[in-house]
């Protein structure tokens, strides 16, 4: 009995949070081995009240709307199971971070786990792309290229993230997290390591050939120009110089954004038209959480092969209202963009790590918002857990500041 009397769930929850952040990009399933026990231990921890943050009510509103949408799903049992293991666990992970990350040392431990995971993912991506031992053939990388449109593009880097677009979204979030720490005025040896990591992240981002990720990266440059230093606008001259002088597959992929010759561009436009029809016909509850792939065949006018399964609309702004209805979409987007607003307040008013995490939070929200215009990377469990986890981490400093103020008053 004495063992249980001195048992401290909080310590174990913290370690499990660190492990979860490390495992998230490495496997779409492995991180559950640390996340589920963390949720269970937090539930047992009666001494620590849960914190939902300033935007929690909007998150709860989205959970409620998505739950109600299950009633109109063509497969209620599937939608319910999906709802329990995706949005509910996203929210649980989000709450865990806001509840248990209480000081800068704990924030730094999370960052170490994130950066260590990023190093592993980058190394694996480079080894994979180098085609050591015929790895690209074994991993079916050819499934993500269009040889008819891009005959010289033989493979795209995707590392551990299932496909290149998801890998691009992951890289954008880590890049957004790294950049602010390079902007600190203090010269430290860590900045050299951050710069090396950033260089490899950008290198890998280029080799994903993910056009949506590239456009999102340009949006980050605009944000740096607006919120930090106008000299960052010079980076656009570098991009223009590369596009004008280099005529390889990078340039071809980028220019293809502005035409419908590429099959993926035409497919997206057709998907958006079909998804908009879903929103028009089901404005209140949507078509049911997780049911897009079940309902899409009824709206399909583009894809001739009936064996092709379409899981999402490749557009966040259409996907969400389509599956949960317009009220649910309002809750979702207030919750989503609200993190950028709260992070901006942390950037303007915070001190130390809270300030720089605030800037990271702004960049992460912006990157995923732009990326969501032509894709829906948050469909992936790993990417969604990562995004909401980072969003919570980047505003967790606001809770730390409040605790310090309350402690001072006492």
Regions found by a protein language model. Give the residues of each.
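Membrane-interface catalytic loops of GT-C/OST-like multi-pass glycosylation enzymes that act
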Residues: 77-78, 82, 161-164, 209-212, ...
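A membrane-periplasm/extracellular boundary helix in multi-pass inner-membrane enzymes
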Residues: 71, 123, 129-132, 208, ...
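Alpha-helical transmembrane segments of multi-pass inner-membrane proteins
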Residues: 18-20, 35-38, 67, 92, ...
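Transmembrane alpha-helices of multi-pass inner-membrane enzymes
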Residues: 36-42, 231, 359-410
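Transmembrane signal-anchor hairpin modules in multi-pass inner-membrane enzymes, especially those
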Residues: 1-82, 102-115, 182-192, 344, ...
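Membrane-interface micro-motifs in multi-pass membrane enzymes
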Residues: 25-33, 82, 159-171, 321-325, ...
């Amino acid at each position: 009995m004495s063992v249980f009397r001195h048992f401290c769930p909080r310590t174990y929850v913290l370690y499990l949070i660190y492990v979860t952040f490390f495992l998230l990009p490495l496997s779409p399933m492995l991180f559950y081995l640390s996340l589920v026990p963390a949720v269970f231990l937090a539930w047992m921890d009666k001494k620590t009240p849960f914190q939902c943050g300033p935007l929690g009510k909007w998150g709860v509103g989205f959970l409620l709307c998505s739950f109600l949408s299950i009633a109109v799903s063509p497969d209620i049992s599937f939608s319910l199971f999906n709802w329990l293991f995706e949005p509910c666990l996203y929210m649980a992970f989000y709450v865990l971070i806001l509840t248990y990350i209480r000081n800068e040392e704990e924030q730094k431990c999370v960052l170490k786990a994130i950066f260590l995971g990023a190093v592993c993912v980058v190394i694996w991506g480079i080894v994979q792309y180098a085609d050591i031992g015929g790895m690209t053939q074994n991993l079916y990388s050819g499934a993500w290229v269009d040889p008819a449109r891009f005959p010289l593009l033989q493979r795209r880097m995707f590392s551990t993230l299932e496909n290149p677009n998801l890998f691009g979204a992951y890289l954008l979030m880590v890049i957004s997290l790294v950049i602010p720490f390079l902007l600190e005025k203090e010269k430290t040896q860590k900045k050299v390591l951050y710069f090396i990591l950033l260089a490899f992240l950008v290198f890998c981002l280029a080799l994903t050939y993910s056009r949506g990720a590239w456009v999102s990266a340009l949006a980050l440059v605009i944000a740096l120009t607006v919120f930090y230093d106008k000299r960052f606008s010079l980076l656009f001259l570098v991009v223009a110089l590369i596009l004008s002088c280099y005529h390889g597959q990078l340039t071809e992929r980028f220019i293809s954004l502005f035409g419908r010759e590429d099959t993926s561009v035409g497919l997206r436009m057709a998907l958006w038209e079909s998804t908009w029809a879903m929103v028009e016909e089901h404005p209140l509850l949507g078509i049911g959480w997780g049911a897009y792939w079940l309902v899409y065949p009824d709206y399909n006018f583009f894809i001739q092969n009936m064996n092709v399964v379409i899981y999402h609309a490749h557009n966040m702004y259409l996907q969400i209202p389509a599956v949960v209805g317009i009220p649910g979409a309002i809750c979702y987007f207030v919750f989503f963009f609200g993190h950028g607003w709260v992070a901006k307040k942390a950037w303007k008013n915070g001190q130390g790590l809270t300030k720089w995490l605030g800037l990271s939070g702004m960049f992460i929200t912006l990157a995923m918002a732009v990326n969501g215009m032509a894709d829906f990377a948050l469909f992936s469990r790993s990417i969604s857990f990562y995004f909401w986890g980072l969003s919570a981490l980047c505003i967790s400093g606001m809770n730390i500041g409040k605790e310090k103020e309350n402690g001072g008053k006492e």
